Regions:
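Glycan-recognition and catalytic cores of secretory/periplasmic carbohydrate-active enzymes
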Residues: 1-285
Length: 285
């Protein structure tokens, strides 16, 4: 993803071979069920995890211009098939974070975990690619999944999107895999909100659904009030459930210039197009 963006911005061809070699290794590893996850604590023999297919889908889509297009699209379809055929099946709109390869439950904290941020992120990736790669039915499922995930994860009492859920509702037993972060299930985390904004606005743009538009506005205004620092800029990393900053630090483990700039840029592009087409001053504001 990064090498492809650099190549496009610099108009340099020096990294194209590295991009293709990296894709070939990714294509091999993502299909190998015995290939351990980057994070060893996330690896479970006989299990597959949502995150690997979600980010593979987007990385390949970003790098497609430097790859064999047919091979890239086949891998994108493979990832979508795993997401909807193994980690999410049926019409309940739920994508689980971990399942067996046969789509069966794993009776553990990870097995019952629902990660709203991963789901929102995954679904707007799907909406961007599904029709182009010949999986239009997944676009419809993605729209439904975004709606269901928002209804389950939006905190009606305090606002914002909850960090983690279980398939039985909110799970107060959630423990973050990184002890240095020790995030709690009910906290509000920067990247989860950013991906939710992107998914909700992409859904509203695709469908014209006023409910999705209102959900986006509600979440955006909440983020603007609670995450954004009006004095020094940028977003705080983590908020308590009530919307107060858990810490004043802006950076931290994994919080870099990625989720927030990407989501806000993506949203601004959609809104600019919408304003140009409709002249809606509310959206412009």
């Amino acid at each position: 993803m990064a090498l492809s963006a650099y190549a496009a911005a610099s108009e340099s061809t020096e990294d194209e071979n590295v991009i293709r070699e990296t894709f070939d290794r990714l294509d091999q590893n993502i299909r190998n069920e015995d290939c351990r996850d980057t994070f060893p604590q996330e690896y479970k023999a006989g299990a597959v995890s949502h995150g690997r297919y979600m980010i593979c889908l987007n990385s390949v889509a970003c790098a497609r211009g430097y790859l064999d297009g047919d091979k890239a699209d086949e891998l994108i379809r493979f990832c979508m098939d795993r997401i909807f055929g193994v980690l999410g099946h049926g019409d309940d709109g739920i994508i689980h974070e971990m399942r067996t390869l046969q789509g069966e439950y794993i009776d553990s904290e990870e097995g019952h975990r629902i990660n709203p941020g991963h789901i929102f992120e995954s679904m707007w990736f799907v909406l961007e690619q599904a029709e182009r790669v010949g999986r239009p039915e997944y676009a419809e499922r993605a729209l439904h999944t975004i709606s269901v995930t928002y209804q389950r994860s939006h905190d009606e009492k305090f606002g914002g999107i909850l960090h983690m859920l279980s398939d039985n509702g909110t799970d107060e037993q959630y423990k973050d895999w990184n002890a240095a972060r020790h995030l709690k299930w009910d906290e509000k985390v920067w990247w989860t909100q950013a991906e939710a904004l992107c998914a909700l606005l992409t859904s509203a743009d695709r469908t014209g659904d006023s409910a999705a538009w209102e959900e986006f506005k509600t979440l955006f205004l909440w983020c603007r009030e609670h995450f954004f620092d009006p004095d020094y800029g940028e977003w705080y990393a983590v908020l308590n459930r009530d919307g107060s900053p858990r810490m004043k630090l802006k950076g931290g483990i994994q919080k870099a210039a990625f989720h927030i700039p990407r989501a806000l840029y993506q949203c601004s592009c959609i809104l600019k197009k919408y304003v140009a087409e409709t002249g809606d001053c509310d959206a412009q504001t």
